[in-house]
Amino acid sequence: SEGFSLYVGIPFCPSICSYCSFSSSPVGEWKDKIDAYLDALIKELKALGRMAGERKPDTVYVGGGTPTTLEAGQLDRLLGTIRNCFDLSELKEFTVEAGRPDSITREKLMALKKNGISRISVNPQTMKQQTLDIIGRHHTVDDTIQSFKLARELGFDNINMDLIMGLPEETLDDVRHTMELVKELAPDNVTIHSLAVKRAARLTIFKDRYSDMQMINTQEH
């Protein structure tokens, strides 16, 4: 009853996926603002640490956006601040959304490992290249596979993978293919989301571009 969960948001991504309605900006356009954002975030974390007093977090989750749009040194600075500001002696899980394979590097994963991250998420959403291109993901299926294998090589033994069902132009056979490839990687957890296109998503804003594409939007049901 005395514990709490801490969520830390990094509102930057390599690119903005067409289905996404989260508050996130393309990192290429905001790269010169990231250090200022981190300065403000760290100031807030220090204040929260003082407010927490003797209370200890049960879980810490660093999400976004895509936290690994930060450079390795920036990740190290952020995670080190969390470790210094809060008593993590009773922490059950420390998760970082490693996220998109096009932002994962050995150096960044090593920074996560150094700071005691116990769980990461590698999120392809689909293992069909055509769909990745349609939804604006600038990575390949093989990038996903290699990023996952790299994380295993570096000793991460609790890896989640996020998938979305109902993406544009995907069939049941495409989903089966995705699941077969994911099964071969043997992640420790798989999170399945159904596509829910909200008003801030590009699929809504530019809906004429996607009007002839088949998709299953659970937001309409």
Show which residues each predicted segment covers:
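Flexible, acidic/Gly-rich N-terminal and inter-domain linker regions that tether
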Residues: S1-G3
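Conserved non-cysteine loop/helix-boundary elements of the Radical SAM core domain that shape
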Residues: S24-H221
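Canonical Radical SAM [4Fe-4S] cluster-binding loop centered on the CxxxCxxC motif
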Residues: S5-A36
